[in-house]
Structure formats: structure tokens, C-alpha cells
Amino acid sequence: MPVLNTSNLLTRPQIIAVLTENYADLAQQFSVASLALFGSYARDEQTPQSDVDLLVTFSKPVGFAFMHLADRLEAPLGKRVDLLAADGIKPNRRDSIHASLIHVAP
């Protein structure tokens, strides 16, 4: 298991680059249709303790692979990843999530 990066801040462009580089593999392996960054990294308000918040849309149901996707992304990012399925956004959080949303792929 990789050691997560708690002392070094990644930048938004670095995160977007990692996600873009890995998108084709994620689409094939996990049926990822789209990825979007939101939260503190999207707003450039991250701290060393911040996780990477990602909104994911899948091309088909993925079941437990959802959890494996988070693990797969934590390795290249060196940060804890918090995934949210696009169809799982609670109505009371929709506006705040969409306010900081940065579409990464495709």
C-alpha cells in the first residue's frame, strides 16, 4: 500500500495531469465515463491534510469496483481520494459541488 502524501501539497494542475494520464486505463478497467475535480483542490484551498474529491460518472454499474477505483487513484496521487458517484449527490450539496467542479476527462 502506498504511503499517502500528507506533507507535500499537490497543485490543481498536477492532479489534473495525473487524472488525464490515467483516464484511458480507468475507463477500461473501471468503466469510468467522466471525472471531475471538486472541493478544496478545485478551489485552490487545499491544506497538507486535504483529500482529493472526485465526481465520477460510470458507463455501467460497477459495484465494489467503486472502492478499488479510489485505491487505484490514491497510488499515483499520493493522497487520499474521496469519490462521489454523479448519481449520488445529495440535493443539499449539489450547488456547492457544482460551484467548484472542474471537468477533467473526457
Name every feature range the model reports, one short phrase each.
Residues 37:
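Conserved histidines in hydrophobic membrane contexts and catalytic metal-binding motifs
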Residues 1-34, 43-48, 58-106:
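Catalytic core of pol beta-like nucleotidyltransferases
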Residues 53-56:
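Short beta-strand->loop micro-motif that forms the acidic, two-metal-ion catalytic signature
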